[in-house]
Design a protein with these regions (language model features):
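A non-transmembrane, solvent-exposed segment enriched in polar/low-complexity residues
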Residues: 1-139
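Extended amphipathic alpha-helical segments with heptad-repeat/coiled-coil character used for oligomerization
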Residues: 145, 149-215
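Long, charge-rich alpha-helical interaction segments
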Residues: 188-262, 272
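Short active-site neighborhood of thiol/selenol oxidoreductases, capturing the structured segment around
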Residues: 317-350, 361-363
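Structural microenvironment flanking redox-active thiols in thiol-disulfide oxidoreductases
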Residues: 341-380, 395-397
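Short, internal strand/loop/helix patches
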Residues: 378-409, 413
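Non-catalytic, surface beta->alpha helical segment in thiol-disulfide oxidoreductase systems
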Residues: 404-428
Length: 428
């Protein structure tokens, strides 16, 4: 019900397997001649959710996009495991508030006892389901992993959350057996690579190992360990030494690279990191994407000319960013129609900054919005037409200008970049 797009895409990992258009009744049909058992996900923009498929399954999926996850129900052959997984997902989502507010302030032993009680309850329900319906070996393993790795994830988070909640200056001492669960961790199970609880755990686990290991052996205090280059090189080394599953390696390397690169470290550190990354993950399947990001960052360094991108004014004329910024100080910022609250906030912020910096022109670029909708929003929000521009090429702008933060801005003077990673809230 209430479709938000005209089609549904089925993925195995990151590869599309099949797609189907919705018919006049908002229904779709897929038939797979050959099927690899395992975890898939179906995507109906902008939402996605898991589905576990085995040979011979015949599933009907019902949902209302207004409450995508909450309304999702599976029926038919294969329904038992999939309904358990979606119920588990919803239950886990709702538990985080309880864990953070009620469990995290507790001492380590009490925290573990509370958390393990939740885990035991879920495993008990899974065992009952398995006894009644005899789940496949791989299906059972995946459901169990969904429970275990979410539990492990919270235990990895606990020392840092606890320090924050209690207001302690250093991490709390932990019992010797607190991390015993790590002996159960698999670094090379291909069936779990794209399972969110597993990946979320693995990413935080690597970061935790990097932090704790450096705290013991690098002769640095906790604040300095978070040095961008130092900490992230530790993460690269750990992924390289621990993780053997290729897809998992590639994805973890990619995530660490993106998180580091988008923090805009010094030019020297940036090049050191990239050299280390290429030495450890030179065949990464995401390499083109990572190299493109790194090149875009290089092109936004101080004193570099603005990239050759065109935008459209309200008269339908195309202008280059360089021409718009050719005289004096200009700050480019970004907004989009589908994010109305952000538009209100950023408009208010730009108004304040314009009064504070009358010698600077603040120029808005609208992304991910139709041309007609853009023009309507200009009037609705009282935006000056001469300082507002539009582009229909979101991908080029997002990638070339590295627009990954809602208050990302670019400060220029006479057509050259002063700060390619300015923040409207903190840089002015």
């Amino acid at each position: 019900m209430n479709p938000t797009d005209s089609y549904v895409i089925l993925y195995k990992g990151e590869e599309p397997v099949d797609s189907a258009l919705l018919d006049a009744d908002n229904r779709f049909f897929m038939e797979l001649d050959s099927l690899e058992e395992g975890l898939y996900n179906f995507y109906h923009r902008p939402e996605f959710q898991y589905v576990y498929l085995e040979k011979g399954d015949s599933l009907q999926i019902r949902l209302n996009t207004v409450s995508f996850d909450e309304s999702l129900v599976f029926s038919g052959r294969g329904e038992t495991l999939n309904n358990f997984l979606i119920d588990l997902y919803l239950e886990t989502e709702s538990e985080e508030g309880l864990i953070r507010h009620s469990f995290v302030p507790l001492e380590p032993q009490a925290f573990s006892a509370k958390l393990d009680s939740l885990k035991s309850n879920k495993i008990s329900r899974l065992e009952s389901l398995h006894n009644d319906f005899t789940l496949s070996e791989n299906g059972y393993e995946l459901a169990l992993a969904s429970i275990l790795y979410k539990n492990f994830y919270y235990k990895e988070k606990y020392p840092f959350w606890h320090r924050q909640v209690i207001g302690e200056g250093v991490l709390h001492d932990l019992p010797a057996d607190f991390y015993d669960y790590r002996s159960q961790v698999s670094y090379d199970n291909p069936n779990l690579t794209f399972l969110k609880p597993y990946y979320d755990f693995m990413l935080y686990h690597i970061g935790n190992l990097a932090f704790m290991g450096c705290q013991k052996s690098c002769d640095m205090d906790q604040a300095k360990i978070r040095n961008q280059l130092h900490f992230n090189q530790h993460q690269l080394q750990l992924i390289d030494s621990l993780v053997t599953g290729q897809d998992l390696r590639d994805n973890l390397f990619r995530t660490v690279a993106f998180e580091y690169l988008l923090k805009n470290d010094t030019e020297e550190n940036f090049e050191i990191f990239m050299e280390d990354f290429h030495a450890r993950s030179g065949e990464n399947r995401h390499l083109e994407e990572i190299n493109h990001l790194s090149e875009s960052i290089r092109n936004l360094r101080p004193n570099v000319e603005l990239p050759a991108l065109l935008v459209e004014n309200t008269e339908g004329e195309n202008l280059s960013l360089k021409d718009i910024a050719s005289r004096g100080k200009v700050v480019f910022y970004f907004w989009s129609g589908p994010e109305p609250r952000h538009l209100v906030n950023i408009t208010r912020r730009v108004h304040d900054l314009s009064e504070k910096h009358p010698d600077t022109r603040f120029v808005g670029i609208c992304l991910r919005t139709s041309r007609d909708r853009w023009k309507t929003l200009l009037g609705n929000h009282g935006l000056k037409e001469e300082d507002q521009f539009w582009t229909g090429d979101f991908q080029s702008f997002a990638h070339t200008l590295v627009v990954y933060h809602p208050f990302k801005s670019i400060l220029t003077k006479d057509g050259r970049i002063i700060d390619g990673f300015a923040n409207l809230n903190t840089s002015f």
